[in-house]
Curated annotation (Swiss-Prot):
InterPro entries (alphabetical): Domain_X, Maturase_MatK, Maturase_MatK_N
GO CC term, one of those recorded: chloroplast
Primary subcellular site in the record, as a coarse category: plastid
Protein name: Maturase K
GO molecular function: RNA binding
Family: Belongs to the intron maturase 2 family. MatK subfamily.
Functional note: Usually encoded in the trnK tRNA gene intron. Probably assists in splicing its own and other chloroplast group II introns.
Source taxon at top rank: Eukaryota
KW tRNA processing (keyword) present: yes
Subcellular location: Plastid, Chloroplast
Amino acid sequence: MKESQVFLERDRSRQQDFLYPLIFREYVYGLAYSHDLNRSTFVENVGYDNDNKYSLLIVKRLITRMYQQNHLIISANDSNKNPFLGYNKNFYSKIISEGFAIVVEIPFFLQFSSSLEEAEIIKSYKNLRSIHSIFPFLEDKFPHLNYVSDIRIPYPIHLEILVQILRYWVKDAPFFHLLRLFLYNFCNRNSWITPKKSISTFSKSNPRLFLFLYNFYVCEYESIFLFLRKKSSHLRFKSFSVFFERIFFYAKREHLVEVFAKDFSSTLTLFKDPLIHYVRYQGKSILASKNAPLLMNKWKHYFIHLWECFFDVWSQPGTIHIKQLSEHSFYLLGYFSNVRLNRSVVRSQMLQNTFLIEIVSKKLDIIVPIIPIIRSLAKAKFCNVLGHPISKAVWADSSDFDIIDRFLRICRNLSHYYNGSSKKKSLYRIKYILRLSCIKTLACKHKSTVRAFLKRSGSEELLEEFFTEEEEILSLIFPRASATLHKFNGNRIWYLDILLSNDLVNHE
């Protein structure tokens, strides 16, 4: 997005009203393609001709066709015959959808950058982007709380809801007409899919555009939640996030106050809770409080009414779970967390009398969920459902170096991500499964048994990197503490360079 800021900084004041002409600019599609290359997720269109890859010639041909209005006329019965957006030739549709995401992100990226500069957190923004930056906050705040609500944000059933939310921010009618054109064309092509699965299929075919629309849906409901939170509390509210000032928010806020004054007049008076914390990642959020569970039930009913009445999204009964932190754990970002009581006895002596004082302190215990990870490893064919390592037969055609490098990369990523666990035993078991799966894969490639392969190759020299890798990383971080590296193995280490979670971590 840095390139987009260079291109559009000169016209910054008018971009919000004139997004439609940007779809006809070649550099927009170049930005979309370079972004995919940087993320290493650009998919060559399987099932199409070799010419259906990104090139400047294809983009110019696409822009020329977009100027011809007859190519944009679509009917539900004519999708297969349409040369521009047909089911069999939808490569242009894919390119334009990627360009849509770039164009609609531009004004909000500029607003977000200016908001960071005004808040003077631009220097620490890179650290705040890390997934692990959430856990120090949890360790500091959650031991003092008693109850937690585990909330799963429901998806909008219809894509039109996402478009309507975006219309409150950007006022460009032609742009949204064309956006609806693509969304309805997608629904017509997948009419055999149920509405609930349709949005899931759309998220896979157009991930960038879908994530942008979905994030706006989440930001919309969070902005209303934050408004009511500040309205109900007389204390000063501090937020760890940067929220934009919405165009349509104040008119909607008056309507909300009117509605909640009728239906929740007695509820709002009970919402004064100075110790309430809200954390969200992707489609899951955590709401924690120190007060009685009655307040948490009030917030639960508030969320359900907000989703169903304001966003027309049906919320299932099991969407929100209220738990007591001292008795139950909650799942977030691949970890199981709960508040554990630490008891210690202190001996105190006064003159000739000796007293034993028991001190009870609370500590947030963050552990690795071994069973979900074993399920993920079994799904990826590294082990069976019981956790017994098996050979990765798909990789048997690769060279020995590539096989070992792949296993080491996965082991390194998991070890890097789960190094914040307070108990390392589960992490060592995961590394053992990957190590033995690597050995079995190499033995399968050479058509020999595991014992014969290790005897011929030498197990210590072949896979010693599985054991030395973590110590090498710690020696780089703490170069003067090499003699006490084993001390850090039992402690938590949170890394501020983790921007994405591994696929094996996403168990849900």
